[in-house]
Regions:
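Extended alpha-helical scaffolding segments
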Residues: 1-8, 12-190
Length: 190
């Protein structure tokens, strides 16, 4: 779930349902927890909805602001595709939300943790030494898509845990935890 500008909320469910709701129509209460307050979805119908194949991983990346197009962008994935979700900042101007394919790929065996950046992603699994690195681009204004690629880095050790892991796309550094240490890998030169 992600709050959006303009009194909107974005909801992405693991089953592949993605919705945007207008929260301005939802009543407010001063009771915490609300007393006899029906669930919010009884007051709100989605203003935009897309049903796609099952989402995989954490469902949505953090939002990325694209000033050139005045949109928010999110990265999400299924078992075989990385997608970008483009949402206009002002829902009254321009086209509505759009789902674009960023990269075709097949989830490697054992890859469970997905760390998404704007143009790259990392995947790894529990107890494996393989770190899968994906590089993709967003479509140009004319719709063309630059080539994407991936590589596998084999890390020392074989006891990497699911969480916590994180990466900084700008510096090219990935932080991973084994069962007894925290390690920072630098992929800036790749």
């Amino acid at each position: 779930m992600q709050l959006l500008p303009g009194d909107r909320v974005l909801i992405a469910e693991g089953g592949g349902l993605i919705q945007i709701h207008d929260t301005a129509s939802i009543g407010t209460t001063t009771s915490i927890p609300p007393v006899d307050f029906p669930p919010w979805f009884e007051y709100s119908s989605p203003t935009w909805e897309l049903q796609m194949e099952c989402l995989y991983g954490e469902r949505l990346s953090q939002p990325y602001l694209c000033r050139k197009t005045n949109t928010l962008r999110f990265v999400l994935n299924t078992l075989d595709t990385v997608y970008g979700l483009v949402i206009p900042i002002d829902d009254h101007l321009g086209p509505g939300p759009e789902l674009v394919m960023l990269m075709d790929f097949h989830k490697p065996e054992g890859a469970e943790v997905f760390l998404f950046g704007y143009n790259s992603a990392f995947m790894h699994g529990d107890g494996t030494s393989d770190l899968h690195i994906l590089n993709y681009s967003w479509p140009e204004p004319d719709g063309t898509l630059k080539p994407s690629d991936s590589l596998v880095a084999t890390l020392d050790g074989d006891r990497w845990r699911y969480l916590p892991s994180d990466f900084d796309e700008g510096s090219g550094r990935v932080v991973m935890c084994s069962y007894n240490e925290v390690v920072v890998f630098d992929f800036a030169t790749l």
